[in-house]
Amino acid sequence: MWTLLTGFCPSLDGAHLANQPKSRQSTAFTNYESTQAHSTLPMTKPVLYTFGASVWSAVPEVAFRELGYGPNDIELKTINLLQGENFSPAFLKINPKATLPTLTVGDKAYTSTEEVVDYLIDNAPKPVKKATGSEKDIIARIHQDDIDPNFALLLSRSDEEKKARADGIVLAFLSGRQNALEKHAVTPEAAEFSEFYKAKIEGNGGLLSVYADKAPEDAKQKFYESSKQHWENLRDFILNVLPGYLPNSGFVAGAAPGEVDFHLGAWLTRIIATTGAKDVSELETELKQPVPTKVASYWKAWSDRDSWKTVYAEGLH
C-alpha cells in the first residue's frame, strides 16, 4: 500500500510537527551569524522553500550554516506541510513534484534536495568537499524508497503501533493533506495538474484509511507487512551497509562535513527520531543488537557540530 505514496513529500516529519513552534518554522536561519564576508550569489536573492520539521529540508539548513552564508543571503519561505500548502497550484507551478526543499533563483527552480545543496555549495562563501564517485552513490542510496526516512515516520507494524501514531500527529497530518488535496483539485488552476492530484488523493487516502480504521482488514495487514519489511531494510542498512561508508572518526568527507555528510546526517537523524529516541545508542532496541561503533562515532561527530545543534535545537526530526 505504501508504494501508492511514490512522491510522498520527502520533507515532512509527523512525529515532531506538532511540537514545532512557529518561530522555528518561519525563521530557520535567523540566528545564524556568518563569519564570511562574501558569497557568489547572484543579484537576484535566491528563495528557499522549506519547513522546520522536514527531514530533507534539514539538509540545506545544516549546509547553509556550514557553508558560511549570512542570514540575509537567501530568502526563506515556509511551506506548511501540516496544511498541505505544498499541494497548492501556485506551488506546483514552481515544483510539480510538490516536494521540499525547493530553491528558486530568478526563473530557475531547483526541485530536489541534491540540486538545492549542489547550488548552495557552488555559490558558497566557504568551500566544502563536493561529492564525487562513491560519495554520490551514497547520496543516491539514502534517497531510495526502500530505506525512505519518511515512510519510516508513518509506518506501523501492529494495531498498537498504529494507535500510538494515530493518537499523535499522524492521523491529523494525513487528514490535513487529504483536505488540501481535495480542496485544490477542484479549482480551475489545478486543471493542468489533474493527474498529480488524482494519484495523490488515492495514495494519501489509502494511508489515511488505515489510520482512520476505515481500510479493509486485508489492506491493513498488507500495510503492516510493508512496514515490517521497511524496518528490516533500515536495520540491515544501518548494521551492514552504513558502517562500510563511514570512517573510524570524523566525516565521510574528512575532518569536516562535506556534501555527502549533509544528506547522510539528516537521514540518520530522522531514523533515530522515528523511534522516539534522542540518541543513536537508543536504536539498539530496534536493531536488536548494539549500534555499530562507526555509526555511533559518526553520530557524535555530527551532534557536536554547532550547525547540527541549531537545526535540531527543538528536537530531532
Task: Please place each PLM-identified region on the residue numbering.
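C-terminal or late-domain output modules
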Residues: 41-69, 73-87, 91, 101-103, ...
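GST-like fold's C-terminal all-alpha helical module
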Residues: 151-290, 294-296
